[in-house]
Amino acid sequence: MMTRAQIKQTAHQHLSDARLLLRQGRHDGAIYLGGYVVEMALKERLCRTLRWSGFPQTAKEFANFQSFKTHNLEVLLTLSGVETHVKLHYPTQWRTVAFWNPELRYNLPGTVSRIDAQAFIDAAAVLRRVLSP
């Protein structure tokens, strides 16, 4: 089980790493890692909403929680209990990151522009603060 504190720390570290990749012109990698920032923030928020001390990690821990075993940001937002708030108050940021999925790792380098990567990382940073303060 990953504790809420560990989830928050992981999101923070991924955001720092994504910003570093962005500064180094590694735009595709920045977005790929930036998506995990949002995923972790959503999972921490979900734990808070459900009053869980942590989020399942192993197959055994997920045994009774298969619907929570996802990287789909839309699903995680719905499960987090703050979908209406996020989509109402942060629609631009949400639309910017909502397309993300781990399959982006297969994109060819150079697919993402600097401007798009910067917008994504900025949106991920805002959502991390909102979801997991």
Model-derived regions, located:
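Terminal alpha-helical segments
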Residues: 1-133
